[in-house]
Amino acid sequence: IANTELTPELVYKVAKAGAYVLSKHSDHAPTILIGRDTRISGTLIESAMTAGFLSYGANVKSLGVIPTPAVAYLTKKMKADASVVISASHNTYEFNGVKYFSNKGMKIPDEIEEEIEEMMDSEKLNDFTAVNEKIGTAEVRTDLLDEYVYFFRKNFEEEFENYNTDDFVVAIDTANGATSVVAEKVFTALGIKHYIMNNTPNGININQN
């Protein structure tokens, strides 16, 4: 449960340990994308993760509320070193979680995950702290969601041409989750008539119906 088991202090360690391990496998300060769903705890957890990354010297690009597949796609597209999705999938709003993706937009290898877990428990973690100009930087890149919409249009427009008719309507239930920010854009870009429901997230109504 967010802010109970999954505390900001724990999330900070997850991020700092992750930045350390990623740096070991790279010759530069890593750049990490962060995306989240609509849960009320998302901002809290993202803030703690960002602090952990920056404190080690990693750089962060915040994607804001965005579907998990979009984060995976953008990780590879933007040539980021890794990404993090803050979400608890189908669970109700009280829960939240953190998932790392590799630079290929796939789940990080088990051995890297184990390294991160080991470093989280290490007393050495506090010794690795960036100072002065070595501190990481953060920027908001919610605009990158449009790159994902363009990807859909470019790759699926021809396949959906036969459905661009007045008598074909798609109903989409976004469950007040991360898809709520992109469903309208995607189906409009594809030229498909659509009706969207459960599309007004308020932080606590995700997966409610």
What are these regions (language model features)?
Residues 1-8, 39, 46, 68, ...:
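Short, electropositive, low-hydrophobicity segments enriched in small/polar residues
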Residues 20-24, 28-95, 185-209:
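N-terminal small/polar loop signature for handling phosphorylated ligands or for N-terminal nucleophile
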Residues 1-51, 55-56, 137-170:
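An N-terminal, well-structured beta->alpha segment
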Residues 96-209:
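Gly/Ser/Thr-enriched, mixed-charge loops and adjacent short helices
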